[in-house]
């Protein structure tokens, strides 16, 4: 099947609530791409607006840790989005296969994901649905954040595309302020990332209950249990910093750039800062000898 006279669909990759994603070939440039098609039965006004928003959002972003978007348009009464093809798997797939990760791998993923979010936040874009399924790892293990379908431009409240009081996002990773129906901001993304990193290390997110509503109450009211108390072998520094990401108040969480810098350094290892190199102080010059007392005058 040839979309828009250019993109030849090869095989289906996945299907979500709004559309289906295909592996395809761009026959003009001769490269592999991913093509997302809006499903016809879901092409109502709201879904169409969200699909357009994803394209507009991605067009404002260019960063190694964000899935790039190359093209957008309409074809046979369906909208399509052409994206970078990430040859790899999502963190959700990785967790299914591996259950939990070690601190070093989790720190690398956290640092790269935070760097991608920092780029989005600098453009005034909040993702609003950070979860393992939206964090991809390419063949080299590099993080790529995808699916900006419910993103929000913080300078354009009309871009929320949700009815009043309707919460969008995934309950396991939803920030407390979002659970209370407040507007998402950059700090909300950081809380969600904290939930993901917690799950990478433990195998379970910090909060999980029998119902989505009960889980939301936990995000609002229940302090997260430190990982070290749950038997996870991480440094005290890592554990404490992660609890900061999971702070109940948005203003108490670090920014995306701060998180990226922290995890891309060695602070998460919990090692003491090295002392500055020792340079012996130069020897003090000897004091000059006191001048001899003058000889007494004759007859004095």
Regions found by a protein language model. Give the residues of each.
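Protein kinase catalytic-loop region centered on the HRD/HxD motif
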Residues: 113-125
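AlphaC helix of the eukaryotic protein kinase fold
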Residues: 37-60
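Activation-segment/catalytic-loop signature of the eukaryotic protein kinase fold
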Residues: 72
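Protein kinase glycine-rich loop
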Residues: 9-16, 21
């Amino acid at each position: 099947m040839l979309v828009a006279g250019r993109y030849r669909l090869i095989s289906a990759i996945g299907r979500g609530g709004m559309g289906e994603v295909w592996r395809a070939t761009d026959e003009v440039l001769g490269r592999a791409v991913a093509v997302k098609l809006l499903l016809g039965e879901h092409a109502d006004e709201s879904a169409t607006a969200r699909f357009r928003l994803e394209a507009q959002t991605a067009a404002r972003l260019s960063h190694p840790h964000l899935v790039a978007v190359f093209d957008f348009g309409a074809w046979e009464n369906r909208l399509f989005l052409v994206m970078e093809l990430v040859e790899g798997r999502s963190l959700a797939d990785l967790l299914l296969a591996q259950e939990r990760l070690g601190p070093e791998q989790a720190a690398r993923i956290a640092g790269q994901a935070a760097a991608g979010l920092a780029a989005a936040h600098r453009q005034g874009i909040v993702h609003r649905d950070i979860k393992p399924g939206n964090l991809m790892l390419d063949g080299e293990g590099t993080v790529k954040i995808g699916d900006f379908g419910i993103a929000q431009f913080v300078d354009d409240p009309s871009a929320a595309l949700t009815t009043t009081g309707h919460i969008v996002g995934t309950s396991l990773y939803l920030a407390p302020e979002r659970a209370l129906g407040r507007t998402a901001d950059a700090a909300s993304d950081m809380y969600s990332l904290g939930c993901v990193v917690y799950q990478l290390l433990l195998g379970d997110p910090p909060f999980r209950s029998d119902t989505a509503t009960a889980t939301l109450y936990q995000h609002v009211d229940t302090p997260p249990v430190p990982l070290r108390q749950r038997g996870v072998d991480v440094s005290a520094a890592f554990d404490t910093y992660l609890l900061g990401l999971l702070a109940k108040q948005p203003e108490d969480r670090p920014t995306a750039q701060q998180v990226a810098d922290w995890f891309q350094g060695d602070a998460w290892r919990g090692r003491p800062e090295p002392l500055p190199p020792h340079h012996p102080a130069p020897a003090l010059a000897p004091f000059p000898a006191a001048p001899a007392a003058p000889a007494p005058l004759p007859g004095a």
